[in-house]
Amino acid sequence: MNNDKRFEGLWNAIAEKRYKHFITYAVDQESVWLLANKDGFATMDVDGYIHLLVWPSKEFADAYSDAYSKEDTPVEMDIHEFCERCEELMDDKEIRFMVFPTGKDVWIVSTEGLLSDLTEELERVE
């Protein structure tokens, strides 16, 4: 499968499939991608929650930024550092994660849920 077909297939997949891909790919690559700007990490405030947006690779973060958030730049974070930062956010119930958003739909998960899934996958492969 060439990269364009792979990209399109994942970009157009349902949110749950993209979430599962995010977990396995981020752990395999040992990194996650977020968007950042001069004020810090890009967030979306929806329904009283602050959502951090994350992707499994730069190409998807770039595509989202190009389409919806031109002032934000993709930044890579080591998976272990990301997990540590998630642990620091555990008590803040207003923070959630939008995992692999594409503009059409998104998988929203609590910090605890995301950290649990990433930790489980890390334990499985390490």
Where does each model-flagged region fall?
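Conserved NAD+-utilizing ADP-ribose enzyme module
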Residues: 1-126
